[in-house]
């Protein structure tokens, strides 16, 4: 019995050598729903896959939340997860040396993506930690002379929260408002800079509405007023060209899992010329130039480095493709559905992040209706609460439109079929939900919703 | 060593496409096939033999990556994503993680990784 199973397995392996004939990715999008048949680990049985298979998982259209690992990145990481497991800070044996060499190679890869020197890259556990180091570290170091920071209202939660905790320590923070387009007003920024401002923090590409801030101009303003400029580039690195010297950026946060790298790793760029001093948040053995103590996780940073290298090579190709798919998605939805608003400036916009508001439809109900597509309304960190996103509130979206916004993410691995399927389902469900909506009925009858006096009960 | 001939480049192209079709994950499979086609098409008019050799070497490295990664992504059982009609047939079962209930790391994989 065991012998037969082994023989069958060997036979499958032999016939599978040139590659089993795959079922071609289908044109007819039949989502089959079957029962959860427990999967056995024996490959021979699955060669004849049963028709009533498992429930299919949703299409992934939420790349701003996280991205799948690129196979090239996983390939680079595996040796360091299997055999080359040394601690890169061990100086006395080959395990340490080879691990350290890999770490330094990864550092070089990250640096070359943003035009920095490798000595300016510090590995962290992610963009959240990098943001904390940048904001709290700079503020606390220059605490004696400078007590003011500037940031925007549309920043990521970790930036806003770091600023709030600094306010509790006695710092003053100015939260710049954004215009309707989502972009800050440069004149307001200039007016907000005081003699005791130590840091300006503005994110490069917003994770909820995809708006690109004028980083080069902000960098120029900050350097002329001798204020440090930090940017949270988690959504921008590897997707749009960035150069820390051209854009006069002093600190930059990088996230691994937004650029098809592993989760749990990121980096912070800290300028050396002129030197930006930062007070370390994490004390310990002085690793990473004393700015972030703790063993550097070699497999993760190797993955981050590989992801940055792949991103550098693929940036142009990906950008062209993502722009085309994004155009397709927006055009097809907008021509079939009335009353759809795209949040954020259409011109200064990263195409892979599309935030649409569907009037007279509740966002959560649309998300639940689109159960075959993994989407989000607002950012993942705020998706637990029922409040509309603060970013949409900051750009002045009406309360009702803010509740009906959905964020579509198009990434490197998104296919045209996935976009078409998402568009088709979205149109279908929005129409269906609008049919059920009494507000929609009233609008169709020509009533202006703003003129209605809702009675109190 | 003579520069890569047209026949060798075509063989490489066919081998890469063939290997890429073995990815069980829909997104990886479609990306690999699309990227390989576009990359070879983009570079089809390159004349400089040194540049051609560089591109061929890179393609060979990528072919190695695809060969190593396909069995990994097939070996780990996961439900197929949206647009697939059937769970992609699994290649020879070699997975690295014992915890998934698969066999020991196959010598084939370890050999590829030069470990």
Swiss-Prot record, chain A:
It is an enzyme of class 2 (transferase). Active only in complex with LYRM4. Keywords: Cytoplasm, Cytoskeleton, Iron, Iron-sulfur, Metal-binding, Mitochondrion, Molybdenum cofactor biosynthesis, Nucleus, Pyridoxal phosphate, Transferase, Transit peptide, Zinc. Its EC number is 2.8.1.7. N-gluconoylated. GO terms for cellular component: centrosome; cytosol; mitochondrial [2Fe-2S] assembly complex; mitochondrion; nucleus. Coiled coil: none annotated. It holds the Pfam family Aminotran_5. Disulfide bonds: none annotated. The keyword Transport does not apply. InterPro entries: Aminotrans_V_dom, Aminotrans_V_PyrdxlP_BS, Cys_deSase_IscS, Cysteine_dSase, PyrdxlP-dep_Trfase, PyrdxlP-dep_Trfase_major, PyrdxlP-dep_Trfase_small. The active site is at residue 381. The modification N6-(pyridoxal phosphate)lysine is found at residue 258. Zn(2+) binds at residue 381. Pyridoxal 5'-phosphate binds at residues 127-128, 235, 255, 257, 295. One of its GO terms (biological process) is [2Fe-2S] cluster assembly. The keyword Cytoplasm applies. Belongs to the class-V pyridoxal-phosphate-dependent aminotransferase family. NifS/IscS subfamily. This is Cysteine desulfurase. The lineage of its organism: Eukaryota, Metazoa, Chordata, Craniata, Vertebrata. The gene is NFS1.
């Amino acid at each position: 019995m065991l012998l037969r199973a082994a023989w069958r397995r060997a036979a499958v392996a032999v016939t599978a050598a040139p590659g089993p004939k795959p079922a071609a990715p289908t044109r007819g999008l039949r989502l089959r729903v079957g029962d959860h048949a427990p999967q056995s680990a024996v490959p021979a049985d699955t060669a004849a896959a049963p028709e009533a298979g498992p429930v299919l998982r949703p299409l992934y259209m939420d790349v701003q939340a996280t991205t799948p690992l690129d196979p090239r990145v996983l390939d680079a990481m595996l040796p360091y997860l299997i055999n080359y497991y040394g601690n890169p800070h061990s100086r006395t044996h080959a395990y340490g040396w080879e691990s350290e060499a890999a770490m330094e190679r990864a550092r070089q890869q990250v640096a070359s993506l943003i035009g920095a020197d490798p000595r300016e890259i510090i590995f962290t556990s992610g963009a959240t930690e990098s943001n904390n180091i940048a904001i709290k570290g700079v503020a606390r170091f220059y605490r004696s002379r400078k007590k003011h920071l500037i940031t925007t209202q549309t920043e990521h939660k970790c930036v806003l929260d770091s600023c709030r905790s600094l306010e509790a320590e006695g710092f003053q923070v100015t939260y710049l408002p954004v215009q309707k387009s989502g972009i800050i007003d440069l004149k307001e920024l200039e007016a907000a800079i005081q003699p005791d401002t130590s840091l300006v923090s503005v994110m490069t590409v917003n994770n909820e509405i995809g708006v690109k801030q004028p980083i080069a101009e902000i960098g120029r303003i900050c350097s002329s007023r001798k204020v440090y400029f930090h940017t949270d580039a988690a959504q921008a690195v590897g997707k749009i060209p960035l150069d820390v010297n051209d854009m006069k950026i002093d600190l930059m946060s990088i996230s691994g899992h937004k650029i098809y790298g592993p989760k749990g790793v990121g980096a912070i760029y800290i300028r050396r010329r002129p030197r930006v001093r930062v007070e370390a948040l994490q004390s310990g053995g002085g690793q990473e130039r004393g700015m972030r103590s703790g063993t550097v996780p070699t497999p993760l940073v190797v993955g981050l480095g590989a992801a940055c290298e792949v991103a550098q090579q693929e940036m142009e190709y990906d950008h062209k493709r993502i722009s085309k798919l994004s155009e397709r998605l927006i055009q097809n939805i907008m021509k079939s559905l009335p009353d759809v608003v795209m949040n954020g400036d259409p011109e200064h916009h990263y195409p892979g992040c599309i935030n649409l508001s569907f009037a007279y439809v509740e966002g959560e109900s649309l998300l639940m209706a689109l159960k075959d597509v993994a989407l989000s309304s607002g950012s993942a960190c705020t998706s637990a609460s029922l409040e509309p996103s603060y970013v949409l509130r900051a750009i002045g979206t009406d309360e009702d439109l803010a509740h009906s916004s959905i964020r579509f993410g198009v990434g490197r691995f998104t296919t045209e079929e996935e976009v078409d399927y998402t568009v088709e389902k979205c149109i279908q469900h929005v129409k269906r939900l609008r049919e059920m909506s009494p507000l929609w009925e009233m609008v169709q009858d020509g009533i202006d919703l703003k003129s209605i006096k809702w009675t109190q009960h | 060593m003579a520069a890569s001939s047209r026949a060798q480049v075509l063989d490489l192209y066919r081998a890469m496409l063939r290997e890429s079709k073995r990815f069980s994950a829909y997104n990886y499979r479609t990306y690999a096939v699309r990227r390989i086609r576009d990359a070879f098409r983009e570079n089809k008019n390159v004349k400089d033999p040194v540049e051609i050799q560089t591109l061929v070497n890179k393609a060979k490295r990528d072919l190695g990556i695809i060969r190593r990664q396909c069995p990994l992504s097939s070996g780990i059982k996961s439900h197929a994503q949206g647009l697939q009609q059937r769970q992609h047939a699994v290649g020879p079962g070699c997975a690295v993680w014992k915890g998934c209930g698969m066999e020991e790391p196959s010598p084939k994989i370890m050999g590829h990784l030069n470990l």
